[in-house]
Design a protein with these regions (language model features):
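Membrane-integral, polyisoprenol-dependent glycosyltransferases
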Residues: 1-293, 299-328
Length: 328
């Protein structure tokens, strides 16, 4: 009965874990993140460590905490320990998506979706890199799936795990960690007949609650970094969204998002093309809501990506996962 789940776990681990330390850091982004964890361990400053004697981190600390904690166990910060959090995040997201769709469709389709997710180029690449994107994606996707489960159960109780996932996402890369999950579920709930003001207040409240833990770090970092920290936060968040950064960072046109989406899902983009000429698959009533959630998620994510003047390929990983589930 549990063989498909065991297969997903084993395949994910075998595809990722043995290979993380085989190559040196090969982009400027990887050592930039790893050195933050190294500075934390060397200086003992876990709030706002100074890197190379002059720089403060460009991103919130959750990803760096993960690297530092893993490196404490091995005794050093190296390529393997720096990439391990991304790999574990991808494994967790793959397993989580499998369990989610197995309960709402069947084991065969859930297994297919999990393997498509794990082997798509952009997702797999992020899972073996020392960058914040994979941990951010896992937290955002986790929040969406948990919010959906909460909605599915009649919106009863409090979705604590979903809120904690958003907190982790905010502590990984900033406000996008709560904006995207709440916006997606807000759109989905309205599509499913939810009342506008009630839905808006509900997800607005969840967004505020998800900021409690990140606020503790932001306040502590502000006390330590002062105006320089505030200027950096403004540029990395507001400046990045409005295209007013003092330097160009991954600035691309709107069509670039779709080009990245198609190449990032390689080699499975061919399946999407071939499916255009096949007969529509029958949908069961049990999966109608899940399909609607995927559609709302993909559309909302595309909107958020187009509004970001410096959208990264890593920001499209959530859409890759949801689009391949729709293809199934």
């Amino acid at each position: 009965k549990n063989m498909p789940l065991i297969a997903v776990v084993v395949i994910s681990c075998v595809m990722l874990l043995p290979f993380l330390g085989l190559t040196d850091f090969n982009t400027k982004g990887e050592p930039r993140e790893a050195v933050v964890a190294l500075s934390m361990l060397n200086s003992g400053d876990w709030i706002l460590p100074v890197n190379n004697g002059m720089d403060i981190p460009y991103k919130p600390p959750f990803f760096h905490y993960c690297i530092a904690l893993v490196s404490l166990l091995t005794g050093s910060v190296d390529e393997y320990t720096s990439r391990l959090p991304s790999a574990l995040a991808l494994i967790g997201m793959t397993v989580g998506c499998f369990v989610f769709y197995k309960r709402r469709r069947n084991a065969q389709q859930a297994l297919m979706g999990a393997l498509l997710l794990l082997t798509s180029f952009e997702v797999h690449r992020a899972g073996v890199n020392c960058r914040v994107d994979m941990v951010l994606t896992a937290c955002v996707v986790g929040a969406m799936l948990l919010f959906y489960r909460w909605w599915e159960r009649g919106s009863k109780g409090f979705p604590l795990l979903a809120v904690l996932c958003m907190s982790g996402a905010v502590l990984t890369k900033g406000p996008v960690g709560f904006v995207l999950p709440c916006f997606v579920m807000w759109v989905f709930t309205l599509i499913r007949g939810g009342r506008f003001w009630r839905t808006s207040l509900t997800y607005g409240g969840f967004a505020l609650l998800s900021l409690i833990l990140p606020a503790l770090w932001y306040v502590a970092a502000w006390h330590e970094g002062g105006q320089h920290f505030l200027d950096l936060i403004y540029e990395e968040n507001i400046g990045r969204m409005t295209g007013s950064m003092s330097y160009e960072s991954h600035t691309h046109s709107f069509p670039y998002n779709f080009f990245t989406l198609s190449t990032g899902w390689a080699p499975w983009t061919l399946l999407l093309i071939f499916s255009l000429f096949s007969k529509p698959w029958k949908r069961s009533a049990a999966s109608a809501e899940a399909a609607s959630a995927s559609e709302a998620s993909a559309a909302s994510s595309a909107k958020s990506a187009s509004s970001d003047k410096s959208s990264l390929p890593g920001g499209l990983k959530g859409k890759l996962m949801r689009w391949q589930i729709r293809l199934m």
